């Protein structure tokens, strides 16, 4: 981008000097005079082990605010005041708006709602049950949170409809009104950009290790994740199973709200239970609600931040009650790539009081031990948490 004379901004949540010292590609970008660095390092986290909470929240706030400000500046010379007002352009102090939103979310009534809902999900999962969310405009927010749960807490990932071997994911999201191909495009705001790469192309790229059996990541494979209104027997294959409609307060005032709820009720007939959850002020009834008067804006930034924080809090709080957090560390991490393996080693080092080197050896001893386990056991036991349990108190 810099070589094409674009203005380049690099945003991250680590101390700049740590990145410069240890990661070559980061140092090159940080030291490039054409790059504007935005270091959003927020210090130690109350609950650590994933970037899904404080780090991405601060990035969403800063990047979202920048986009809304830019949109305002670009459109002001073009649109009338009435048109700008209709698009919810206004002067916003994003720092104060975010602080006010946090205070609203952590108020007594909303905290109780979060606690009650977390206990509800915990009870479902303790009985080996499944939760399927139904959403419209919040589909992306929910899909992001639910898919992140898999590597963060070593849960079963989303599975395709023709996969008869893998267990269903604990949670899933669907749109009650649209079929799957349309839902993917609606959620992304464009057609999905999938890869139709064959073995020859992987060899050309020097990836000989996977060329013999290249990953299938084309559009047909994507559409096998049934996030639309098609019936998916896997979502009711275990009991208890629950359907949960999640809407923002703003959505409940739209003309299509009744159609959504009717479609949700029709889809939910296949489930044992159904619940509704509204985030934001609304005059509609719901089983669970987070009450707060969210300021509107072109991208509805504060609403999306509140939805994100609500979902993050629910999923993380549920995993705490499920025993997948040690102290304040998300210790049931999956080590499916090098980044997560490094994270696991650092978790073991911190919690067990081992050096990084000894923690690395301890984790790999566990992985060697796990070779004797069945595939089902490998998927259900976190090697990081197992290593922590084995080494706690020994040092």
Feature-to-residue mapping (PLM):
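Conserved N-terminal alpha-helical segment that immediately precedes and caps sugar-phosphate-binding
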Residues: 1-395
């Amino acid at each position: 981008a810099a070589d094409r004379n674009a203005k380049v901004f690099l945003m991250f949540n680590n101390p700049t000097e740590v990145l410069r010292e240890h990661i070559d590609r980061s140092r090159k970008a940080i030291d490039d005079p054409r790059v504007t660095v935005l270091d959003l390092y927020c210090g130690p986290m109350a609950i650590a082990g994933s970037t899904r909470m404080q780090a991405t929240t601060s990035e969403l706030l800063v990047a979202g605010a920048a986009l809304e400000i830019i949109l305002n500046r670009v459109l002001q010379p073009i649109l009338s005041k009435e048109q700008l007002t209709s698009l919810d352009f206004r002067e916003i102090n994003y720092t104060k708006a975010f602080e006010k939103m946090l205070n609203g979310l952590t108020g007594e009534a909303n905290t109780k709602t979060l606690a009650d809902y977390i206990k509800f999900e915990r009870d479902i999962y303790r009985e080996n049950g499944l939760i399927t969310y139904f959403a419209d405009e919040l589909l992306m927010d929910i899909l992001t949170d639910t898919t992140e749960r898999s590597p963060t807490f070593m849960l079963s990932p989303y599975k395709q409809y023709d996969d008869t071997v893998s267990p269903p994911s604990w949670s899933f999201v669907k749109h009650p009104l649209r079929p799957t191909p349309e839902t993917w495009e609606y959620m992304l705001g464009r057609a999905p950009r999938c890869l139709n790469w064959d073995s020859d192309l992987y060899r050309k790229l020097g990836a000989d290790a996977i060329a013999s059996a290249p990953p299938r990541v084309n559009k047909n494979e994507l559409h096998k994740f049934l996030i639309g209104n098609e019936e998916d027997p896997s979502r009711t294959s275990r009991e208890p199973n629950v359907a949960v409609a999640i809407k923002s307060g703003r959505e409940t005032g739209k003309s299509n709200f009744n159609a959504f709820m009717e479609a949700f009720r029709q889809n939910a007939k296949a489930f044992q239970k159904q619940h509704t959850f509204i985030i934001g002020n609304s005059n509609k009834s719901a089983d669970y609600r987070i009450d707060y008067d969210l300021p509107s804006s072109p991208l509805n930034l504060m609403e999306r931040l509140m939805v994100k924080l609500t979902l993050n809090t629910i999923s993380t709080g549920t995993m705490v009650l499920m025993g997948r957090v040690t102290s304040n560390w998300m210790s049931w991490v999956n080590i499916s790539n090098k980044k997560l393996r490094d994270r696991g080693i650092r978790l073991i080092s911190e919690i067990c009081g081992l050096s990084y080197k000894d923690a690395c050896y301890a984790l790999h001893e566990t992985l060697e031990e796990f070779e004797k386990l069945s595939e089902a056991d490998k998927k259900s036991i976190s090697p990081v948490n197992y290593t922590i349990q084995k080494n706690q108190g020994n040092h």
